[in-house]
Amino acid sequence: MLHPIDTTIYRAGTSRGLYFLASDLPAEPSERDAALISIMGSGHPLQIDGMGGGNSLTSKVAIVSASTQRSEFDVDYLFCQVGITERFVDTAPNCGNLMSGVAAFAIERGLVQPHPSDTTCLVRIFNLNSRQASELVIPVYNGRVHYDDIDDMHMQRPSARVGLRFLDTVGSCTGKLLPTGNASDWIDGLKVSIIDSAVPVVFIRQHDVGITGSEAPATLNANTALLDRLERVRLEAGRRMGLGDVSGSVVPKLSLIGPGTETTTFTARYFTPKACHNAHAVTGAICTAGAAYIDGSVVCEILSSRASACSASQRRISIEHPSGVLEVGLVPPENAAQSLVDVAVVERSVALIAHARVYYTTPDRRRSYDSPLTSPSTPADTHNLFDAAYRPVIQPSDTDVEAPHMLALENKEQCVSRCDTALHHIVASYGASDAHASDRSLS
């Protein structure tokens, strides 16, 4: 059975996703997840039967509602990473890129209403994944989102510039900045840093795994030996962080980190977690920025070794990734002696792609030959006859070597006879006096 649901599609940062009102989706989490899996077409590498796009950057969903339980916030936001070949929905991490579209969606759907004279709108967001707060500032004109704020030749359509302030980013998943209690650990012969700020990330130096940091994602994704080793490290890191078996989770993430160029602080290849990101996650960049100022972390060691490293007072880092550069500004805590970051500031852009109606199926209502289709106006036994006519005359066994079409040709006359009989019964059920079928052939 098909169920319609309205959605808005945005390109948000370097991701694309579908945005839904929470009230439009099933309330029970398992039913909600089943609906999202159906909408995105998960289970096929191209998600050809849905909206996912066959890529982790586009198989994303934002679920938004008015924040009725928390008066200090405008909206609640739940991020869902939907599997591609695997049929799953992971709500453990936040997604900063997709969050950049939440303010636009909240305004478009009437959850937030700017004054007609406002030129910017502040939207206060409570993230249900990390249980943390963020603020988004978006340009508006006459009470609507101003998508013409950016007109960049590198963008396919006009976009709105969004400022994101991540508040209290420490311990997004584990409640601790250093989940293992250490700034660095050794796993599988590698020195790593496991940091939880905005999202849990395992940092590994690029040269320790034999890469330069200039490799294309496709090159790294083809390196099965590297991917296998990174997954071993990630699984052990998850155990040490207290997350248990993370083989079925998208956290912790992995970042292969190295020194940047003359104009950037770092180069990074970010894994999501079993494939290299085509760009870089915003939350991962925030974690990188925080890790850069944690004494003893591998990220801090890289920063400290560079003559052009930014000063602690600037608290701004830039990360070169496969698609460009991502900058993060940091607001240090009131107690400067602490190696913590209270607020991280990032700028993204958001482009409106479509307001649309999509459809999802209810799994237990899918038709099969074991449960024939019936309707009030047509006798059920008529459908049973018609279904029987189209079933294979001979069911191939495991030892059959003939192709299915050869079996169909060999039993052509039997199949025609069955269809003819079914047609007789169908017409007769509606009171017709004759239902001869003649000159039929199978092509």
UniProtKB/Swiss-Prot annotation:
Pathway: Secondary metabolite biosynthesis. GO terms for molecular function: isomerase activity. It is found in: Cytoplasm, Cytosol; Nucleus. Its EC number is 5.-.-.-. Disruption phenotype: Abolishes the production of itaconic acid. Keywords: Cytoplasm, Isomerase, Nucleus. GO terms for cellular component: cytosol; nucleus. Disulfide bonds: none annotated. It comes from the Eukaryota. Aconitate-delta-isomerase; part of the gene cluster that mediates the biosynthesis of itaconic acid and 2-hydroxyparaconate. Cis-aconitate is secreted by the mitochondrial tricarboxylate transporter MTT1. In the cytosol cis-aconitate is converted into trans-aconitate via isomerization by the aconitate-delta-isomerase ADI1. Decarboxylation of trans-aconitate by the trans-aconitate decarboxylase TAD1 then leads then to the production of itaconic acid. Belongs to the PrpF family. PANTHER family: ACONITATE ISOMERASE-RELATED, DUF453 DOMAIN PROTEIN (AFU_ORTHOLOGUE AFUA_6G00360). This is Aconitate-delta-isomerase 1. The gene is ADI1.
